[in-house]
């Protein structure tokens, strides 16, 4: 029933539209045209204005032909860099870029799958219940679209986000994440003529970082320092450095413990030096902690999981529940009371120029989504 050629054409069309974070207007317009041609009612919310983007989240609703609880389907429209000027190449059944950019299968493979699913339903006059499609902006830079989604437009209480790799899995657990920013203030001085008059902010930050346990802490907790910015010239003792990092965990107690350890390491180094310094108030430390997203944990006996597993069974497949180390729009929907499982599209090596997605995987994902909608309508 899936039109492979059409699915491939749709994905290639979408992949080659520039849509890096905060610049999703062009792809949103094209998705809107396709959905309107199939009879959808469309809204664009005000998320773009709130986050400094050129458009908001795109919400499309289909009334359905049968009475059933509304079902949410989600994908995000933005991509990471390098994501401009993409050429999508299909070879031996696998899409890649030309090697100079990402492909954008994350998450345009999901958009193509959702659009193909709706086309199949409409052209075959299949029974279906109300559908609420949510195509978000700025997922890649902090789930910002989902965080600013106009919930007055959403009535669904369960749904599926297509933003994982494995087409034979459903992600039911994802971690909480804290974002941390440290600004270490030192004192500038000439590095050659009078280095002893300076306080090297980079050196202090380095000591604090050296005292941290980074990488995989345990099976459900990670810690990372990802950005260090500071210094103006090699002959100047740097008076400021900014360090940014994150902690993720499926356990809130562990999340808070590692977050506290990071803060303590920086504070300890700065306070220790300050105790030996004759410069009033220096060195100094500014600390910011922001909750990026909260963990999700959907029980295996929840209807959103059971429905997807039944659909897979009907197709002669077995869907396995999975745990993710990353965040997705589903984390935010979960916070807002919408139980959202995350399904795979087959995408691989996301966020790299080696990114790929197999057409067979996209077909399998479409078949699963069709069966989920069919069963949901019957239930």
Pin down the residues of each PLM region.
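Acidic, glycine-rich active-site loops and adjacent beta-strand->loop/helix elements
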Residues: 48, 77-79, 134-142, 164-166, ...
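N-terminal capping segment at the start of a domain
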Residues: 1-25, 291, 350-352
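Active-site metal-coordination/substrate-binding segment of hydrolases
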Residues: 28, 53-57, 61-63, 67-130, ...
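A non-catalytic alpha/beta surface segment that caps or lines the substrate-entry region
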Residues: 20-67
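Metal-dependent amide/peptide-bond hydrolase catalytic core
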Residues: 202-379
């Amino acid at each position: 029933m899936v039109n492979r050629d059409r699915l491939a054409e749709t994905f290639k069309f979408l992949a080659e539209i520039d849509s890096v974070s905060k610049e999703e207007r062009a792809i949103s317009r094209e998705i809107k045209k396709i959905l309107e041609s199939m009879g959808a009612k469309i809204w664009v919310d005000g998320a773009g204005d709130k986050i400094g983007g050129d458009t908001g989240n795109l919400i499309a609703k289909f009334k359905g032909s049968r009475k059933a609880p509304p079902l949410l389907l989600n994908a995000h429209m933005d991509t990471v860099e390098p994501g401009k000027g993409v050429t999508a190449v299909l070879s031996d059944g696998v899409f890649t870029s030309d090697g100079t950019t990402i492909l954008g299968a994350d998450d345009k493979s999901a958009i193509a799958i959702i659009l193909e699913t709706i086309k199949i339903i409409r052209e075959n006059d299949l029974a279906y219940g109300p559908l609420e499609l949510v195509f978000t902006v700025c997922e890649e830079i902090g789930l910002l679209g989902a965080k600013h989604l106009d919930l007055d437009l959403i009535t669904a209480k369960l749904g599926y986000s297509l933003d994982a790799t494995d087409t034979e899995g459903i992600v039911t657990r994802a971690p909480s994440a804290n974002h941390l920013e440290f600004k270490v203030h030192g004192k500038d001085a000439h590095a050659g003529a009078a280095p002893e008059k300076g306080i090297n902010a980079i050196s202090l930050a380095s000591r604090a970082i050296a005292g941290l346990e980074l990488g995989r802490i345990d099976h459900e907790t990670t810690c990372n320092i990802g950005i260090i910015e500071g210094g103006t010239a090699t002959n100047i003792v740097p008076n400021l450095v900014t360090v940014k990092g994150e902690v993720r965990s499926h356990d809130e107690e562990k999340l808070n413990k590692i977050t506290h350890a990071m803060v303590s390491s920086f504070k300890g180094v700065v306070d220790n030096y300050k105790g030996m310094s004759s410069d009033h108030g220096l060195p100094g430390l500014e600390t910011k902690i922001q909750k990026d997203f909260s963990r999700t944990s959907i029980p295996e006996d929840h209807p959103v999981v059971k429905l997807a597993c039944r659909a897979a069974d009907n197709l002669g497949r077995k869907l396995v529940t999975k745990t993710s180390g990353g965040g997705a729009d589903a984390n935010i929907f979960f916070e807002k009371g919408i139980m959202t499982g995350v399904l795979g599209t087959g995408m691989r090596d996301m966020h790299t120029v080696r990114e790929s997605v197999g057409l067979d995987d996209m077909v399998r994902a479409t078949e699963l989504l069709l069966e989920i909608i069919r069963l949901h309508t019957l239930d």
